[in-house]
């Protein structure tokens, strides 16, 4: 955190700034991974939530810069957790794991966590096997949750949407798969393989009647419009280069960038 300690003198029309930086650090020996933070931070009140490449998800009080709780997810966490407050006053995180340079296949974990206690509410029981091609593969080949989950609204208010990269399917093919899980139980409602890898965070679009749509990109350069209730792909548009960032939307207008250095404006009709 950075306290700016500003002082404004109205009479002399001057302002002074005396910034004081407070840093939070920690050490761990859970796994032999680099202790980097790939994802972003979620926040609730004074609390900040983030995971690291060693698989430690933690809550830090931003006033005291002290850990409130920390849990070991067993594999790397590379996504920004999604946070939701429910009508009963509960505060929850949705997140998942990713495989580092292990050169192996392993189960990908999709979880709902109590944000105030760190207790695991549920873990998806679907057999989602992530496959890492080799220890020499590029970071883009990481298997697991690289994208932020989408907290459903409208007609999909009971769903949480995960984009899981580099999943090994029953026929041994590899691609990203979008999973819709029941927020209350973690049970799988639908899944949609994408045929290629994807690290793009899905966004939700909602009509006034609550009808829901999902927009996301993939490494093949395809911008995809999906039915949020069923997962069916309704329309696609290929932009020529990989889409790894999250699209931004306003009404029926979407802006998205590609790794080819282009920024596109797309209108939904």
Segment roles from a protein language model:
Residues 1-269:
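Extracytoplasmic/lumenal domain signature
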């Amino acid at each position: 955190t950075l306290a700016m300690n500003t002082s404004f003198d109205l009479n002399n029309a001057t302002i002074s700034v005396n910034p004081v930086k407070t840093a939070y650090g920690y050490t761990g020996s859970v796994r032999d991974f680099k202790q980097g933070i790939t994802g972003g931070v979620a926040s609730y009140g004074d609390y900040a939530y983030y995971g690291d490449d060693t698989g430690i998800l933690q809550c830090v009080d931003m006033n005291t810069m002290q850990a409130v709780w920390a849990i070991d997810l067993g594999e790397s966490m590379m996504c920004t957790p999604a946070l939701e407050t429910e009508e009963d006053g509960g505060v929850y995180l949705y997140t998942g794991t990713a495989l580092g340079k292990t050169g192996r296949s392993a189960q990908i974990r999709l979880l709902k966590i109590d944000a105030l206690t760190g207790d695991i509410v549920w873990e998806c029981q679907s057999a989602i096997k992530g496959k890492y091609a080799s220890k020499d593969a590029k970071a883009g080949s990481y298997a697991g949750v690289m994208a932020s989950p989408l907290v459903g609204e409208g007609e999909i208010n009971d769903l949480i949407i995960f984009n899981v990269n580099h999943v090994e399917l029953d026929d041994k093919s590899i691609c990203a798969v979008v999973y819709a899980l029941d927020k209350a139980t973690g049970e799988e409602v639908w899944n949609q393989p994408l045929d290629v890898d994807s690290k793009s965070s899905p966004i939700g679009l909602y009509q006034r009647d609550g009808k829901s749509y999902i927009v996301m990109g993939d490494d093949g350069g395809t911008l995809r419009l999906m039915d949020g209730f069923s997962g069916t792909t309704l329309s696609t548009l290929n932009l020529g280069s990989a889409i790894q960032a999250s699209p931004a939307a306003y009404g029926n207008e979407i802006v998205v960038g590609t790794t080819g250095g282009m920024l596109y404006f797309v209108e939904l009709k």
